[in-house]
Amino acid sequence: MKVKVQTLDAKASGDIELNDEVFAVEPRADILARVVQWQLHNRRAPARAARERSDVARTGKKFGRQKGGGTARHGDRRAPVFIGGGKAHGPRARVFESSLNKKVRALGLKMALSSKAKDGKLVVVDTLELKDAKTKALIAKIGKLGFGATALVIDGEAVDNGFQLASSNIHTINVLPAIGANVYDILKHETLVLTRAAVEKLEARFNG
């Protein structure tokens, strides 16, 4: 698959040949859903347990007499009705992490990249280097390139520092190095922007 490459000034900068095994895989909703769910499960922090009645370190002695005291028929001070007592039906400790086969994860990433290419939402730029690392200047360039409502920009080994600084105040743009490319973030944004270096890194990731 051949795609046109642009500069940040929206000028033509030649073409790039994309590997069909990475950027032309037929997307499957079930695979993409499994990978996204796996990502979100692993992002979730473990649930902490609350101390229930049996977990509270308080006396087990009966609170007052059963009859004749003029009060409720309480058992011990660990009951949920007392301050310092246990929690009634409290949350238990739970870890939400799940596992997913490496091949399925790799296939999901290929499908996410391919879905953007198929929908015409893939933009390839030559480099992210900015002469003037200012937010105002970057917004003007983005308008010419047509990034859409939201864009995920992926660079090579590391994101260009000037571009990262200039884009940090633009809430519709997120940037990642190639190693951080993932299905959830790609699908979450309307447009996927790759540099030449990012394309090389992503293709090497699957071929290596």
From Swiss-Prot:
Coiled coil: none annotated. Belongs to the universal ribosomal protein uL4 family. GO terms for molecular function: rRNA binding; structural constituent of ribosome. GO terms for biological process: translation. One of the primary rRNA binding proteins, this protein initially binds near the 5'-end of the 23S rRNA. It is important during the early stages of 50S assembly. It makes multiple contacts with different domains of the 23S rRNA in the assembled 50S subunit and ribosome. Forms part of the polypeptide exit tunnel. Part of the 50S ribosomal subunit. InterPro entries: Ribosomal_uL4 (IPR002136), Ribosomal_uL4-like (IPR013005), Ribosomal_uL4_dom_sf (IPR023574). This is Large ribosomal subunit protein uL4. It comes from the Bacteria. One of its GO terms (cellular component) is ribosome. Residues 49-58 have a biased composition (Basic and acidic residues). PANTHER family: 50S RIBOSOMAL PROTEIN L4 (PTHR10746), LARGE RIBOSOMAL SUBUNIT PROTEIN UL4M (PTHR10746:SF6). Keywords: Ribonucleoprotein, Ribosomal protein, RNA-binding, rRNA-binding. Residues 47-84 are annotated as: Disordered. It comes from Rhizorhabdus wittichii (strain DSM 6014 / CCUG 31198 / JCM 15750 / NBRC 105917 / EY 4224 / RW1) (Sphingomonas wittichii). The keyword Coiled coil does not apply. The keyword Ribosomal protein applies. NCBIfam families: rplD_bact.
